[in-house]
Amino acid sequence: NIAISKKNSNITNMFNATLLACLYHKYSEVVDLQVLRLVSDSIAGNNRCINYRGQRLNHRILRYTYYLSQLKNNLNFNKDAKFIICDIGGGYGGLLRLLKHYYKNSCCILVELPETCLLASYFLKKNFPNKKILLHSDINDENFNFSNYDFVIMPQHQIENLPDKSID
């Protein structure tokens, strides 16, 4: 893991930034270039990144880029179609953020521990202030239509509220 940190010396951070830029180019051999050029990490959460070619890069965003590229290349999803993505155990929503940027019309469902749902709701609201986000506290009916939302954030005990065969 290549860390850019306040705890490191300037020389160590410069060395790590150079390694991260090299890793970016190494990823270009296995990641769809359209996806690689699209990604940039969020400023929400005050994470440490390098600015390279106008993109905010860190190790995590490059890993998510690889995942998005693999999904894009192995699933027959139309980029502009409305479909439903579910990320179980997706943490604060970093990967879902990339998926939503690429598949703009999708509904993204995050199933996570209740404590982490709080972080995810903050992160996704900061990144998508104009998108409709359904929080688990707003789910009061088993027959809610989650496809009317851009994001649905729910704890794992509410996964039973997802209808069978509703995830693409």
Regions found by a protein language model. Give the residues of each.
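The AdoMet/dcAdoMet-binding core of the Class I SAM-like
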Residues: N1-M14, V111-L119, F123-L124, E160
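A short acidic, Gly/Pro-enriched loop at the edge of an enzyme's catalytic core
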Residues: E160-D168
